[in-house]
Amino acid sequence: MTRHLIFAAVLLVCLFVCWNAIGAQDARSAFSSEETAQDQHVMEERIFINPAGNREKNACLENCRSSPNCKNYEFCSK
């Protein structure tokens, strides 16, 4: 009986450790994709800070509309 309890306890600990490892990996993955989206948004801003013409301004607006992290189009109007 004691062996069964020890085995069950060890099994639960292993399950808990594996569950936390998977959760940590998901959290890192989510952080990484959020970081990538922010980097992409910053790159779009850098590209269009000094637009050389109307065509680039329109491209800026299109890029901003397609980006989920873009809250406003202020940098496109400069």
Swiss-Prot record:
Top-level taxon in the UniProt lineage: Eukaryota
Leader sequence segment: 1-24
Residues of the propeptide: 25-28
Keywords: Disulfide bond, Secreted, Signal, Toxin
Post-translational modification: Contains 2 disulfide bonds.
Key word Secreted present: yes
Protein name: U-scoloptoxin(04)-Er1a
Annotated source species: Ethmostigmus rubripes (Giant centipede)
